[in-house]
Amino acid sequence: MKFLIDECLSPELAKMAIEKGHGETSHVVWMKLGGLKDWELKPIILEGDWTFVTKNSVDFRGPKDKPGTKGQYADVAIHAGLICLNGHPAWTSTCRSSCLSRR
């Protein structure tokens, strides 16, 4: 898979994905896209055929009670994918990395 990691997540996740064999993985900051709004990232994600990894799921999939209704992907018929790493607010980047490194 070709992952693009959102700037709200650690670049360590991108490094981990590369080490696990996903060599086309990148991070928003590495691509000099940090600070862009979600709607500005959307065409880059779609044109690059990226599977986007974020913890801001509502921004992309819409509210949990009505997924797909108001998120950035609501008007997209098909895309490479969206991975939402949601969790308890106390779930730190270290916890995310630890969980993701288990395969």
Curated annotation (Swiss-Prot):
Keyword annotations from UniProtKB, A to Z: Plasmid
UniProt-listed InterPro entries: DUF5615
Pfam families associated with the record: DUF5615 (PF18480)
Protein name (database record): Uncharacterized protein y4eN
Species of provenance: Sinorhizobium fredii (strain NBRC 101917 / NGR234)
Native organism taxonomy: Bacteria, Pseudomonadati, Pseudomonadota, Alphaproteobacteria, Hyphomicrobiales
